Structure formats: structure tokens, C-alpha cells
Design a protein with these regions (language model features):
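Catalytic nucleophile loop
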Residues: 109-111, 130-154
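Bacterial N-terminal signal peptides that target proteins for export
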Residues: 1-7
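Catalytic-core regions built around general acid/base machinery
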Residues: 100-103, 123-137
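Hydrophobic h-region of N-terminal signal peptides that target proteins for export
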Residues: 10-19
């Protein structure tokens, strides 16, 4: 127990050594990722000097999942793309994860099975280390199940989605990288509106964001968001007795904090 506590301190403190940068997220809805979104991720991570750490823990074959991400990023020429140690992690694996995280300028949460990925992040030491590295300035990209895991309240994929009832939508604790937002993916393609509507009604303080297959949402500073490559839906349940639904087309922006659209000509800062 004492060893785990010490490792948690090491993982968090080592990631916090450098000055904090504005948080940057590239959230992919699954399927074929928009090239513009992958290019932005590599740019945010440092371009040719980028060192990307892939967490392929949601897939049945972690090596195959890692290779798929590496192949997708290759056209954008990051400096290094490496994989995380396999889960479940023991003490030596956590130390190795710390070593790879502290030198990473970008972290990629690959897709797969949401439950399997959330099982990996149920290790508090691992989850805290990823959060700390993100808050310390590493760009984070996530795809499919990885996108769902970014939420504080993460959709597991299980439940009865024929009704709009939050009690029928299974959720677990996620990473919480994007405060106040619950994320869904493969959204319009797989007709997942019911489960997101249900969770927003059940948790009106959370903004629901559904990212369609082939689309992405670029987010800076936990707030400034831009749809890329396809459609993104934002669902606001904070107004008593009604849901406000916003459909964002590629290039359109949204303020996640104010829960309002940006102007069509605006773009996410720091392009």
C-alpha cells in the first residue's frame, strides 16, 4: 500500500515539473479520423519534435491497436510514437508508465471496448498520472471508447437505449479531463441520441456532447471547441423543462463554458 502511494506521488510530481500549459484535446468520434484533426494533434504535441504515447488498452490486441494509431499518425511526421506498458500494471509497470509519460508531449487514448479501457483507468495511480500529464501541457487525443473515457461520467455502452431514462444508461468514473461535459461517440451514425439525452436530463449540470463517426471536436482551455470533419451535437439541459440542442457542422465553434455557439468564421485559438 505504501509502495502504491509513493508511486502515485512520483507519477504526479514528475509530470508537474514543467510550467502548466493550456489544456488541448482532440476528441475523435470513431471510424476514419479527419486528417485535419490528426494534423492538429501532432502540431499541438510539437510537430516533428512530438513524442506521442499511445494507450491501446481498450483493444483485444494492444499491439494491433498501437500499430493502427501509429499508421494513422505517420503522414503527419511526429518525432516518436511509442506504446504504453500492457495492463494490468504492477509496480514496475507503473514506474515505466511514469517514465514514458514524463517525456511524452502527446498522449493518444485508442478505442476498443469501453469497459476494458475504464478497467485500466480504475487504477487510481494510472488515472492520476494521465490527468497530471494532460494538465501539465501534453496534448491528448482520444478515439471512440477513448473519447468516452475522457468524461468524468463515462458511458460504458451498456443499458437500454430504447427509452430516455438515465437509470437505463450504465456509466462509470472516467478520467475527467474535460470538466462539466459528458461525451458520446459514433453518435449520429449509431443513433445514440437517446442515451445522451437521458444522461443530460438526469445530470443537468453536465453538457452532453455527441461526436459523430468520422468527426472530431478540437478543444482548448476546457472551453473553446471546434467541429472538424463531420457533425457534433451539444445538448444543454440546464434550462428547466427543456433541452437545448445545437448541431455543429464542420468549422463551427462552441463555447463549452457559456454553452453557446461561436460565429461561423471563428476558429479554435492556436491553430
Amino acid at each position: 500500500m505504501r509502495v502504491r502511494a509513493c508511486l502515485a506521488v512520483l507519477l504526479i510530481s514528475s509530470a508537474a515539473a514543467a510550467p502548466a500549459a493550456e489544456p488541448r484535446l482532440v476528441l475523435l468520434g470513431g471510424g476514419r479520423a479527419p486528417e485535419a484533426a490528426l494534423a492538429r494533434f501532432v502540431q499541438w504535441a510539437g510537430g516533428p519534435r512530438a513524442r506521442i504515447l499511445v494507450l491501446p488498452w481498450g483493444g483485444e490486441d494492444a499491439r494491433e491497436g498501437f500499430q493502427a494509431v501509429k499508421d494513422a499518425l505517420r503522414p503527419f511526421a511526429p518525432g516518436v510514437v511509442e506504446t504504453a506498458p500492457p495492463v494490468p500494471l504492477r509496480d514496475d509497470g507503473r514506474v515505466e508508465l511514469r517514465r514514458r509519460l514524463e517525456r511524452a508531449t502527446g498522449v493518444f487514448l485508442a478505442g476498443g471496448d469501453q469497459q476494458r479501457l475504464l478497467d485500466a483507468f480504475a487504477d487510481d495511480v494510472v488515472a492520476a498520472a494521465v490527468r497530471a500529464r494532460y494538465r501539465d501541457g501534453a496534448a491528448v487525443a482520444a478515439s471512440s471508447a477513448g473519447t468516452a473515457a475522457v468524461s468524468s461520467l463515462a458511458i460504458t455502452g451498456e443499458g437500454d437505449f430504447t427509452v430516455i431514462d438515465a437509470r437505463q444508461v450504465a456509466v462509470r468514473a472516467g478520467l475527467g479531463l474535460l470538466p462539466g461535459v459528458i461525451l458520446d461517440q459514433h453518435f449520429l451514425k449509431r443513433q445514440r441520441e437517446n442515451r445522451l439525452f437521458a444522461l443530460v436530463i438526469g445530470h443537468p449540470r453536465l453538457l452532453g456532447v455527441g461526436i459523430d463517426e468520422g468527426a472530431a471536436l478540437l478543444v482548448r482551455g476546457d472551453r473553446h471547441a471546434e467541429a472538424v470533419g463531420g457533425q457534433v451535437m451539444a445538448v444543454d439541459g440546464s434550462h428547466r423543462g427543456e433541452l437545448r440542442v445545437y448541431l455543429l457542422n464542420p468549422g463551427e465553434t462552441f463555447d463549452l463554458e457559456k454553452r453557446k455557439r461561436g460565429r461561423a468564421a471563428e476558429r479554435t485559438p492556436g491553430r
